[in-house]
C-alpha cells in the first residue's frame, strides 16, 4: 500500500472514533504526574533515599535490556501552584477533557490478580496531561538541569511506544475533521488494567540487592515519578540536609518493595506542629484507653481512592464499574479476614480474650499458622509488636519511621498524619529527623513509645552478607532500642521541665483494711539515674504515703496487680496528677521479691564484682527491708523492658529517702504542702503563685532540683539555719561575688543529666563537648573563688564548698588534647588528634590513600581524553562520577550515569571497583569511630563520682544565689530572721506580709504584727467577718516560718523565731467522694492526725473547725480540740472560728489570746469595709447578711434571713451559756464514748467527762 493510501485509511479510521480517542487518551494521561522541579538538596536526600524499585511491565519490549532493579525513581513531592507556572497548557484546548476520578483506583485488584504484571503508570498522580508532556518532553532544560539519566530512561522505557505517538498527537492540535475518527490498533495507547499488579503485602519488603550509598549534596534531578512505592511520605524541606545525611541510608534490601501498594496516596505532611484536636481529651493513660477501653484491635479495612461513579452495564451484559468494585471489596475483606483472623478475635499471649479478668492488654497471641505465612519483614515486625500492644511502635525503614495498624490509626486520628491503607495493614510515617518531635507529641498525650531501629547500614549489611556461608533471609537487622514513657524520659530534647521526673514502684503489705499498712517505696529519676528507697509503717489514713507522694509527685507508677488495697489506691489518686501513668504488673514474675532481685543482680553484671560491688544502701536493704527491695525489683523489671536497666543501675546512684527527716528538718505533711500551696496551687495544680515559684531563682537546672529538695525539708537546727543565712547575706552584700557566681552559672547546661547520658554511652558528640566545656567553666570559677574570695568566705558554708570542690584541671586539659572539639560539636563526629589512637590513624591513612588513587585515576583520564576540565561529581549516592563536557568523546566501555545540557557523567569498571573499596573503608572507619566514642565515654565515666560532686557543690552555690535573689525581690520591708534556740516555742513578726502577693498589690497590702509563745499566749483564737482575711493571715505566718528555716529573708520589718519541729494545717472544707468520706469526716480525720503528731514546738493552724456539722456539735468539738491543744500539748498556733461563744469559753485561759480581723460596718446599707488589721477582741458578728448583700442576693431574702437569725440567737443563748447542757445534747460525747471505750453515759460520770476538758 502506498504512503498516501495509508494516510487516507488512517484518516478515515480516526474520523469515526474521535470521542473514543479522547476518553482513551485521558484515561492514560490523567494518570501521569507532572515532573517536579524541586532542587532542594535536603528534599533530595530524604526522598531519594526512601524510594523503591518496581518491576518492568510484561508488555514492555524486552530488547530495552533495562535492569529492573537498577532504577531508583524519585518520590512525588507535594507541589504548589508555582511549580506548574511554566508548564500549564491552554485550558481552552479542545483536547483537554474535564477532570474525573480514576474508576480503577480501588486497592482490591492487587489482591484479586496477583499474577498479573504491574501496569507501568500505577499510582501516578492525576496531573494535567499537558503539564506532563511539556515538562517531560518539550520544555528546554536550563544549562545545568539534568536531561539524561538511567532513571529517567527507565521511566519512559517502562511505557509502551504508543505513548509517544499519543503524546505527539496531543502536543499538536488535531483538526476538527479528525475529531470523530477512531484510533487504529497501532495508535491506541497502552492502558493496562488496574488488575495488572504484582503481588503485594501489608508492609515494605526488605528483599533487594541494590544498595544505595550515603546521600551527598547536588542539584535536584528532574525525573518522571514512575511509582509511589516504599516512600509513603516525603521529608519536608525544613528538615536540614545535615540531619538527613547523618541518618542511616535506606535498606538496600528494601528497594524491591514487594509490599508496594501503588494505588494508595502515600504522601504525608509531617514535622509541622499539629493543631490540637478538640474531639480527643487528654487522659491519664490515653494509650490504655485506646487499646483497652476503646474498640478492640481494628481489623484492616480497605480504602478506595477517588470516587467512582456507577455506570450501566454494556450491551453484552458485562458487569458495570460499581458491581466490579463491590466484588473486589468483598474479596479483599475475605482475604484479610482469613489471613488476620487473630486481629479480629484478639487474645493476649496466654490466649485470654478481652474482658477476661486475667487479660493482659500488653501482649497479642499470633497462632503458628500465621507465622508460616509471614514474609521476613512481617516476622520481624510482629515478633516485636506482639509484646508491645499497649505501645505505639515506631519502626525504622531507611530514613523514615513507620507506624502500622492501630498505631497508624492513632497517628492519623490524633495527630492528622496521612493514613495509607496497605493490603493488610494501615500505615503512617514520619521522617527520621523528626522522630524526637513526634515522640514528644505522642508522650504528651499519654502514649508509650517504642523505637525500633536499624542496627546496620545498607553497606554494612552487604559486607556482612558476603561473609556468610549459609543462605539467610534478606532483611536488615532491626531491634528494639528504646521504650519511652512520660515518667522515664532521658533525652534532654524530650524533657519539658528542669525538675525531676520520677517513676515510682509501691509495694504494700496489709493483712486487713483495719490494720496499719507497711510500704516499700523505690523511685528513680531516669534523666539523672538516681534511685531513692525507703520502707515504713503507716497509719490507716496513709499519712506518710500521702506526704511522700506530695513531695515527689511521680509521673509514672508501678503497682502490684491485685495486691494493693483500695484505700491505698484512693490515697495515691488523691496525691498524684491525673496525667500520671499507672502500670499494674503481675506478682512474682514481674514484681520481683528479694531472692529474685539478688539473682538478677548477680547474673546481670550490673556492678563490679557482682553483688559485692553493689552500693551499700542496696546491700543493707537486701538483708533488712524486703518491701523496699521488692519495690526496687518491680522498678528493676520495668527498666529492663525499657532497655534502661544497665544504664541506670550501673551508675550505683542509690540513697535512702526519708520523707519526714524528723531529726534534721521541719516536718510538713502532704496536707500542709497542699494547703499552703508550696509546690502546686489550688487553681490548676500548676506552680504559678506557689512558694516554690516565688523563691526558686536558680540559674541551672540541677540547682532547681536541689532547691526543690531544700524546700521539702527546711532546716530544724538553729546552727544550720544561721549558717545558710550567713552565706545568703554574704552573697547579697557583695556584688562582686554575686556577679562572679552569675557569670559562670548562667552558661552551664544540665550537666547532671548529660553525664548520665555519657555513662549510658548514648551522649551525642556535641553534647559531650558541652559537658567538657561546662566543667571547664565550673573549674575555672572555683579557681577564681579560691583566689579572690576565700578570705571573706572563710568560716562560712561557701568557704567550705570552695575548699571541698575537686580540682579537675589536669583531667580537663587531657581532654583538650584527645580529639577535635570543634568538629565533634559541629559535625557530630569524634576525630582523635594524631597519635592518640593508632587504629584510627591507620584507618584514616588508608582512606586518604584510596582517595588519592581516585584522583590519580582522574588525572589519567584527563590525559587520555585530552581534557583538563574533567572532575568528580557526587549525585545522591552515586559518588565520584566523572563529569565530562558533552562534546568530548569517551571510551565505549564507559557507562553514562547522568548528565546536563553541557556535561555528561560516567562510571567504568575500574572506577567502580575503587569507589566500592573507598565506601567499604569508610564503613569500617565509622565502626572504628563508634568504638572511639565508647572508649571516650568509658574514660570520662571513670571519674563519675568527682564529676557528680562538682555538680552538687555548684548546685548548692546556685541555691544560695537563689535565696539572695529571692530576698531582694520581696520588696521593703524584708529582714534577716533572728533564730533563737530555746526550750519553749516563740514567734515574733513585726509588719508581716504575705510573700506571694504580687508587686502591684504589695503597696496596698496591710501588714500585721504576730506574737506567739514566750511571754505571750501560745494560741490565738481568731474571729472576724467572712472575707476579712483570716485564712490569708494564717497562711502567711506559716510561710514566714518556712522561709526563715529555709535560710531566706522574710517579708517583715523584724522577725524572731524559735525553730519549729513541724507545721500542721487544717484549712478549707472538702469532702472525699472516692473514700466515701463526708466533709465533716474529712475535718475530723485531719484533726485527728494533728492531735496525734503535734508537739510543743509545732505550729498548728485550724480554720473554722466544726463547720461541717450542726452548730451544737461543731461548737462542742471545737471547744474540746482547742482545750486539748492549749492545755495538754502546748503548741503554738491559730484557731479561727465563727463561734463567738467559743471565745467566751476561753476568755480567761492564760494560753489563749482572743483577736479579730477588724472591719467597719454600715448597718443601714449593709456594707462591710474590711480593714484586714489584726487587733485584740472578739468580733461580735460574722456579718453574713452583709456579705450576702455584697454577693447580690435579693433584699427580701436577706431581710427574712436577718429575722430568722435573731430568733435563733435568742433561742440558743441559754444553750451556749450552759456547758452541762452542751455535753448532754451533743453527739460528741457519744463519739468520745466509742473512741475511748468509756462506760455508758450516766448522771454520775457526765460531770467527770466535762471536767476533763477544763
Swiss-Prot record:
User: Biased composition, Basic and acidic residues: where in the chain?
Assistant: 8-18
Positions of modified residues (Phosphoserine): 205, 299, 307, 309
Task: Please provide, in alphabetical order, the Gene Ontology terms of the cellular component aspect for this entry.
Answer: cytosol; MutSalpha complex; nucleus
Q: Which residues form a coiled coil?
A: none
Q: Quote the SUPFAM superfamilies the UniProt record gives.
A: DNA repair protein MutS, domain I, DNA repair protein MutS, domain II, DNA repair protein MutS, domain III, P-loop containing nucleoside triphosphate hydrolases
Q: What Pfam families does this protein map onto?
A: MutS_I, MutS_II, MutS_III, MutS_IV, MutS_V
Tell me if Phosphoprotein is a UniProt keyword of this record: yes
Gene3D superfamilies (UniProt xref)? 1.10.1420.10, DNA repair protein MutS, domain I, MutS, connector domain, P-loop containing nucleotide triphosphate hydrolases
Q: Name one GO biological process term.
A: maintenance of DNA repeat elements
Under the heading InterPro entries, the entry gives: DNA_mismatch_repair_MutS-lik_N (IPR007695), DNA_mismatch_repair_MutS/MSH (IPR017261), DNA_mismatch_repair_MutS_C (IPR000432), DNA_mismatch_repair_MutS_clamp (IPR007861), DNA_mismatch_repair_MutS_core (IPR007696), DNA_mismatch_repair_MutS_N (IPR016151), DNA_mismatch_repair_MutS_sf (IPR036187), DNA_mmatch_repair_MutS_con_dom (IPR007860)
Residues annotated as binding ATP are 1024-1031
Q: What CDD domains does the annotation carry?
A: ABC_MSH6_euk
List where Acidic residues composition bias occurs. 204-213, 251-262
Q: Where is the composition biased (Polar residues)?
A: 79-90
Keyword line = ATP-binding, DNA damage, DNA repair, DNA-binding, Nucleotide-binding, Nucleus, Phosphoprotein
Query: Could you tell me which residues belong to the region Disordered?
Result: 1-324
Composition bias, Low complexity = 62-72, 102-114, 295-313
Q: Which domain of life is it from?
A: Eukaryota
Compartments annotated for it: namely:
Nucleus
- Quote one Gene Ontology molecular function term: ATP binding
Q: Which family does it belong to?
A: Belongs to the DNA mismatch repair MutS family.
| The protein's role, per its UniProt record | Involved in post-replicative DNA-mismatch repair. Has a role towards base-base mispairs and insertion-deletion loops.
Q: Which named protein is this?
A: DNA mismatch repair protein msh6
Give the originating organism.
Answer: Schizosaccharomyces pombe (strain 972 / ATCC 24843)
Cite the source lineage: Eukaryota, Fungi, Dikarya, Ascomycota, Taphrinomycotina
Amino acid at each position: 500500500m502506498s504512503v498516501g493510501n495509508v494516510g487516507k485509511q488512517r484518516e478515515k479510521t480516526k474520523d469515526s472514533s474521535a470521542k473514543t480517542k479522547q476518553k482513551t487518551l485521558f484515561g492514560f494521561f490523567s494518570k501521569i504526574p507532572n515532573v517536579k522541579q524541586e532542587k532542594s538538596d535536603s528534599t533530595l536526600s530524604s526522598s531519594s533515599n526512601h524510594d523503591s524499585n518496581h518491576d518492568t511491565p510484561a508488555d514492555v519490549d524486552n530488547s530495552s535490556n533495562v535492569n529492573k532493579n537498577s532504577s531508583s525513581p524519585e518520590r512525588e513531592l507535594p507541589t504548589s501552584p508555582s511549580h506548574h507556572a511554566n508548564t500549564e497548557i491552554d485550558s481552552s484546548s479542545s483536547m483537554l477533557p474535564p477532570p474525573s476520578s480514576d474508576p480503577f483506583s480501588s486497592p482490591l485488584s492487587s489482591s484479586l490478580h496477583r499474577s498479573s504484571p504491574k501496569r507501568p503508570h500505577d499510582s501516578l498522580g492525576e496531573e494535567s496531561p499537558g503539564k506532563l508532556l511539556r515538562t517531560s518532553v518539550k520544555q528546554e532544560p536550563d544549562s545545568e538541569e539534568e536531561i539524561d539519566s538511567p532513571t529517567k530512561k527507565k521511566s519512559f522505557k517502562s511505557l509502551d511506544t504508543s505513548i509517544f505517538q499519543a503524546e505527539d498527537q496531543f502536543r499538536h492540535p488535531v483538526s476538527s475533521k479528525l475529531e470523530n475518527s477512531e484510533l487504529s490498533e497501532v495508535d491506541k495507547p497502552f492502558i493496562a488494567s488496574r488488575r495488572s499488579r504484582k503481588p503485594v503485602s501489608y508492609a515494605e519488603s526488605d528483599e533487594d540487592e541494590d544498595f544505595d550509598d550515603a546521600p551527598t549534596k547536588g542539584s535536584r534531578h528532574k525525573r518522571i515519578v514512575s511509582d509511589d512505592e516504599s516512600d509513603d511520605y516525603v521529608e519536608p524541606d525544613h528538615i536540614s540536609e545535615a540531619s538527613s545525611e547523618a541518618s542511616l541510608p535506606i535498606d538496600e534490601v528494601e528497594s524491591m518493595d514487594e509490599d508496594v501498594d501503588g494505588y494508595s496516596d502515600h504522601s504525608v505532611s509531617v514535622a509541622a506542629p499539629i493543631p490540637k484536636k478538640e474531639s480527643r481529651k487528654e487522659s491519664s493513660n490515653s494509650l490504655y484507653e485506646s487499646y483497652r477501653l476503646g474498640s478492640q484491635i481494628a481489623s484492616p479495612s480497605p480504602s478506595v481512592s477517588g470516587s467512582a461513579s456507577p455506570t450501566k452495564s454494556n450491551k453484552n451484559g458485562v458487569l458495570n464499574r460499581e458491581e466490579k468494585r463491590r466484588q473486589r471489596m468483598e474479596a479483599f475483606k475475605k482475604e484479610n479476614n482469613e489471613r488476620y483472623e487473630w486481629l479480629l478475635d484478639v487474645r493476649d499471649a496466654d490466649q485470654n480474650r478481652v474482658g477476661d479478668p486475667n487479660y493482659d492488654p500488653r501482649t497479642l497471641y499470633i497462632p503458628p499458622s500465621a507465622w508460616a505465612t509471614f514474609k521476613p519483614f512481617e516476622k520481624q515486625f510482629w515478633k516485636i509488636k506482639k509484646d508491645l500492644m499497649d505501645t505505639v511502635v515506631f519502626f525504622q525503614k531507611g530514613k523514615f519511621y513507620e507506624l502500622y495498624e492501630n498505631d497508624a490509626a492513632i497517628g492519623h486520628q490524633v495527630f492528622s498524619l496521612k493514613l495509607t491503607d496497605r493490603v493488610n495493614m494501615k500505615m503512617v510515617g514520619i521522617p527520621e529527623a523528626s522522630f524526637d518531635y513526634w515522640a514528644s507529641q505522642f508522650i504528651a498525650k499519654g502514649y508509650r513509645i517504642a523505637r525500633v531501629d536499624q542496627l546496620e547500614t545498607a553497606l554494612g549489611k552487604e559486607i556482612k552478607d558476603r561473609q556468610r556461608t549459609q543462605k539467610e533471609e534478606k532483611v536488615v537487622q532491626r531491634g528494639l532500642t528504646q521504650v519511652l514513657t512520660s515518667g522515664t524520659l532521658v533525652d534532654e530534647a524530650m524533657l519539658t521541665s528542669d525538675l525531676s521526673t520520677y517513676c515510682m514502684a509501691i509495694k504494700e503489705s496489709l493483712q486487713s483494711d483495719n490494720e496499719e499498712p507497711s510500704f516499700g517505696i523505690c523511685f528513680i529519676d531516669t534523666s539523672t539515674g538516681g534511685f531513692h528507697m525507703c520502707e515504713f509503717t503507716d497509719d490507716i489514713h496513709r499519712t506518710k504515703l500521702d506526704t511522700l507522694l506530695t513531695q515527689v509527685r511521680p509521673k509514672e507508677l508501678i503497682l502490684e496487680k491485685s495486691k494493693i488495697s483500695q484505700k491505698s489506691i484512693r490515697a495515691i489518686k488523691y496525691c498524684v496528677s491525673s496525667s500520671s501513668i499507672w502500670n499494674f504488673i503481675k506478682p512474682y514474675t514481674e514484681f520481683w521479691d528479694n531472692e529474685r532481685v539478688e539473682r538478677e543482680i548477680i547474673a546481670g553484671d550490673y556492678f563490679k564484682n557482682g553483688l559485692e560491688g553493689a552500693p551499700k544502701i542496696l546491700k543493707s536493704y537486701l538483708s533488712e527491708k524486703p518491701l523496699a527491695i521488692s519495690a526496687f525489683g518491680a522498678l528493676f523489671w520495668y527498666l529492663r523492658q525499657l532497655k534502661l536497666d544497665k544504664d541506670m543501675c550501673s551508675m550505683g546512684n542509690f540513697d535512702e529517702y526519708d520523707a519526714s527527716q524528723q531529726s534534721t528538718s521541719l516536718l510538713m505533711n502532704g496536707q500542709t504542702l497542699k494547703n499552703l500551696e508550696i509546690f502546686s496551687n489550688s487553681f490548676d495544680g500548676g506552680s504559678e503563685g506557689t512558694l516554690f515559684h516565688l523563691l526558686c531563682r536558680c540559674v541551672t537546672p540541677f540547682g532547681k532540683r536541689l532547691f526543690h529538695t531544700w524546700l521539702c525539708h527546711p532546716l530544724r537546727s538553729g546552727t544550720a539555719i544561721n549558717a545558710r543565712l550567713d552565706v545568703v547575706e554574704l552573697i547579697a552584700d557583695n556584688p562582686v561575688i554575686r556577679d562572679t557566681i552569675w557569670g559562670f552559672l548562667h552558661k552551664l547546661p544540665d550537666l547532671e543529666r548529660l553525664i548520665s547520658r555519657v555513662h549510658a554511652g548514648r551522649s551525642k558528640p556535641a553534647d559531650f563537648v558541652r559537658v567538657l566545656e561546662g566543667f571547664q567553666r565550673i573549674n575555672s570559677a572555683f579557681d577564681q573563688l579560691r583566689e579572690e574570695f576565700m578570705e571573706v568566705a572563710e568560716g562560712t558554708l561557701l568557704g567550705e564548698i570552695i575548699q571541698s570542690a575537686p580540682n579537675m584541671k589536669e583531667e580537663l586539659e587531657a581532654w583538650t588534647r584527645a580529639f577535635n572539639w570543634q568538629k565533634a560539636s559541629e559535625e557530630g563526629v569524634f576525630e582523635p588528634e594524631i597519635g592518640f589512637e593508632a587504629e584510627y590513624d591507620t584507618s584514616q591513612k588508608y582512606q586518604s590513600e584510596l582517595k588519592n588513587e581516585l584522583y590519580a585515576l582522574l588525572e589519567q583520564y584527563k590525559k587520555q581524553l585530552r581534557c583538563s576540565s574533567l572532575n568528580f561529581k557526587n549525585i545522591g549516592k552515586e559518588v565520584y562520577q566523572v563529569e565530562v563536557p558533552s562534546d568530548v568523546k569517551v571510551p565505549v566501555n564507559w557507562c553514562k550515569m547522568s548528565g546536563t545540557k553541557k556535561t555528561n557523567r560516567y562510571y567504568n569498571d575500574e572506577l567502580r571497583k575503587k569507589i566500592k573499596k573507598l565506601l567499604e573503608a569508610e564503613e569500617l572507619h565509622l565502626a572504628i569511630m563508634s568504638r572511639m566514642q565508647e572508649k571516650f565515654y568509658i574514660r570520662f565515666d571513670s571519674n563519675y563520682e568527682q564529676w557528680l560532686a562538682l555538680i552538687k557543690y555548684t548546685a548548692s552555690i546556685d541555691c544560695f544565689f537563689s535565696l539572695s535573689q529571692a530576698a531582694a525581690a520581696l520588696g521593703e520591708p524584708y529582714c534577716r530572721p533572728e533564730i533563737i534556740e530555746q526550750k519553749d516555742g516563740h514567734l515574733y513578726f513585726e509588719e508581716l506580709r504575705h510573700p506571694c502577693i504580687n508587686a502591684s498589690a504589695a503597696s496596698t497590702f496591710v501588714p500585721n504584727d504576730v506574737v506567739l509563745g514566750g511571754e505571750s499566749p501560745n494560741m490565738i483564737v481568731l474571729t472576724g467577718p467572712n472575707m476579712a482575711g483570716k485564712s490569708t493571715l494564717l497562711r502567711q505566718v506559716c510561710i514566714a516560718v518556712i522561709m526563715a528555716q529555709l535560710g531566706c529573708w522574710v517579708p517583715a520589718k523584724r522577725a524572731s523565731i524559735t525553730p519549729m519541729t513541724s507545721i500542721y494545717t487544717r484549712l478549707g472544707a472538702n469532702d472525699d467522694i472516692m473514700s466515701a468520706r463526708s466533709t465533716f469526716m474529712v475535718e475530723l480525720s485531719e484533726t485527728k492526725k494533728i492531735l496525734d503528731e503535734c508537739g510543743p514546738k509545732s505550729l498548728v493552724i485550724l480554720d473554722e473547725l466544726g463547720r461541717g456539722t450542726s452548730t451544737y456539735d461543731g461548737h462542742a468539738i471545737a471547744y474540746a480540740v482547742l482545750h486539748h491543744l492549749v492545755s495538754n500539748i502546748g503548741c503554738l498556733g491559730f484557731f479561727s472560728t465563727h463561734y463567738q461563744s467559743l471565745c467566751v469559753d476561753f476568755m480567761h485561759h492564760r494560753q489563749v489570746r482572743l483577736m479579730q480581723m477588724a472591719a467597719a460596718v454600715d448597718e443601714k446599707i449593709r456594707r462591710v469595709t474590711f480593714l484586714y488589721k489584726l487587733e485584740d477582741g472578739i468580733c461580735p458578728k460574722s456579718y453574713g447578711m452583709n456579705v450576702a448583700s455584697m454577693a447580690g442576693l435579693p433584699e427580701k431574702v436577706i431581710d427574712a434571713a436577718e429575722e430568722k437569725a435573731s430568733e435563733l440567737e435568742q433561742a440558743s443563748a441559754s444553750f451556749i451559756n450552759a456547758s452541762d447542757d452542751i455535753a448532754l445534747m451533743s453527739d460528741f460525747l457519744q463519739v468520745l464514748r466509742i473512741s475511748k471505750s468509756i462506760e455508758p453515759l450516766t448522771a454520775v460520770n457526765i460531770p467527770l467527762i466535762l471536767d476533763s476538758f477544763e
